[in-house]
Every structure is written in structure tokens, then in C-alpha cells.
């Protein structure tokens, strides 16, 4: 990747809906080379998806909670259940594996309210058995 690719990626990360003519103008190259670069970045897997970033407050989820999880049983059966639960619940936005702390995982969860989060947390605990 060169500096043009890096500029292109930074721009697309901010707004991938820009018309190709606007992208190429901002990057400083003509449209055909710009389109070719985007396609190459997609083919190489550097650009994986083009997504819409939602305003979670306007979507009805104004509360963000970070849940630390400490696991007592590190086996593949537990991890499979954990992975299935994470994928199933749309309120879980991110999952991070931690090292160097007492927690094993950190989950970023969105909710409609603290009460909604409390209900969700109890349901998650019952499902996964930490």
C-alpha cells in the first residue's frame, strides 16, 4: 500500500457512500485509477465490507455498558456456548479477549435502559454459566 491507498482508506472509513468522482477528487487522482484501487483493496481483503454506522441513541439504545467476564472453566464446550450466545444477541456490539487482568473477556453491550441491561445480563448469565 502506498500513500494514495492510505488516503483512500481513511476517506472510505469516514464515508464510503461518497460518489466515485468525489472520492477521486479528494484523493487527487482520476476516477478510473481510483475505482481500480478500490477494487484491488477489496480483492486483497483490505476492504471487507461497506457498512452503515447507526446513531444508537436515535435507534433506541442510548445506554452503553462494558461487562467484564471472568471464566472459571476454560474448555472448548464453554467457549462454543459463549460464541453462540454472543452471535445470537444483537445487543453485544464487541467482544475482547483480555490478558494481564483478572477478567478474561470484555463485552460492549447496548441497551434501551439500565433496567433493560439488567434483564439482559441475567439472561446472559443463565445461558452461559460463567
Listing of model-derived features with the role each one plays in the protein:
Residues 1-130:
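A compositional/biophysical signature of low hydrophobicity enriched in polar/charged and small residues
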